[in-house]
Structure formats: C-alpha cells, structure tokens
C-alpha cells in the first residue's frame, strides 16, 4: 500500500532509473547492458530520485539558492554557478538535475546548434545529439535527452528549474508552471 507498483514498460530503461535491467525501452532483460562505453547515467535518474524521496522525503537544501547549470559542448562538463564538476568520459551527458529551491536556470548559450529544453518535471534537455548517451552497442538507440529535470515531490514547485537560455541555433524551449524567463538567443526559436 502506498508503493509505486511495477514500472510501466515504456519507462523501464536507464533513461528513467538506474534500477533497471534494460539499457533502453524494449531491450532484452536477459542479456547484459548494451550501452556503449561512457553512455551510462552520471547521476540518479528521475524515478530513482522520486523513489528515494518517497521513502525519505525531499532534500530542499540541495542547491536551494539561485543556481545556474551549464554544460561544455566540447567536454560535457557540468558547471554549477560557473564551477566545474568534472568532465564525463566520451563527452556524453546523461543525468538528472535535482534542485531544492531558488530561481534556477539551464544555460546552453555555449552551444552553436539548436537545443531543445523542456523545463516541465521529467522533461528532457537535448543540448547536442553528439553528446547523447548511446544505449545500444550499434549506436541506434539514443537517450531521449542529455539532461532530465527531476519530478516534483508531492507537487512541491521548489524543485522547478524556472529559466532557460538556448544556444545560437534554432531552439525549442518549453516552460513550466513557474515564472519562466526563456531566452532563445540567436536563431529562429
């Protein structure tokens, strides 16, 4: 009672949880993981965070101030308020951002191509297709995005990312229920 139940088949992959046996939706659970090298999650994913919050509550002290998240197009390194967090291998970005409060933003202004930013809880950011995780050895199955926005715990909007800055290409930016500031930059956004 009060549990999550079985994970829906269309969410049973590393894109949503590291507690899966599937590299991508529809992959075999009897075989080993099929991700290419450097294409594994770099953080807990949205449903992992939701499960922990269900059991222990949400940590709204994590990055509770005004926080800007940005990534390097050449290395994939995450920067939090301009401070590098270490570059991932292979220039792939595959993570979820949980933020405890403040007025926060994704800054993808360093990207020359068009980016897709969905600020809705569980939404995906695609900074660059070249930086997407390859979830199959043949490279056919790509992650849905580079960065997932965490789900809201009990509908609490403190975890929303409110702002987004796109790249210099043709961007698509989707806001959320927060007071969003959405800047497309150059290009036809």
For each of these PLM feature ranges, what is it?
Residues 2-12, 22-31, 54-82, 103-145:
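GD-rich hexapeptide-repeat beta-solenoids
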Residues 10-13, 88-89, 97-101:
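Extracellular/periplasmic catalytic domains that process cell-envelope and extracellular macromolecules
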Residues 14, 100-101, 156, 177:
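Parallel beta-helix/beta-solenoid
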Residues 15, 45-51, 157:
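Stable alpha-helical elements in mature extracytoplasmic
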Residues 18, 96, 105, 116, ...:
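Discrete beta-strand positions within long extracellular beta-solenoid architectures
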Residues 34-42, 83-85, 90-93, 147-150:
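Active-site rim elements
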Residues 43, 88-89, 152-158, 164-166, ...:
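Low-complexity, polar/charged sequence tracts that form flexible coils or short amphipathic helices
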Residues 101, 110-112, 121, 165-170, ...:
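Extracellular, beta-strand-rich repeat scaffolds characterized by small/acidic residue-biased motifs
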């Amino acid at each position: 009672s009060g549990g999550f139940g079985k994970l829906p088949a269309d969410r049973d992959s590393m894109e949503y949880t590291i507690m899966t046996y599937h590299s991508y939706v529809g992959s075999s659970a009897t075989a080993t993981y099929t991700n290419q090298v450097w294409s594994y999650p770099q953080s807990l994913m949205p449903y992992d965070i939701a499960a922990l919050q269900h059991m222990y509550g949400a940590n709204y002290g994590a990055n509770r101030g005004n926080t800007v998240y940005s990534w390097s197009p050449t290395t994939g390194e995450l920067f939090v308020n301009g401070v590098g967090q270490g570059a991932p291998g292979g220039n792939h970005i595959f993570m979820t951002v949980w933020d405890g409060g403040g007025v926060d933003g994704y800054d993808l202004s360093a990207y020359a191509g068009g980016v897709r930013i969905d600020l809705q809880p569980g939404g995906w950011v695609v900074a660059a297709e070249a930086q997407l995780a390859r979830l199959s050895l043949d490279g056919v199955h790509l992650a849905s995005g580079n960065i997932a926005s965490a789900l809201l715990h009990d509908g609490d909007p403190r975890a929303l990312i409110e702002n987004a800055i796109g790249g210099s290409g043709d961007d698509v930016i989707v806001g959320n229920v927060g007071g969003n500031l959405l800047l497309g930059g150059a290009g036809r956004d």
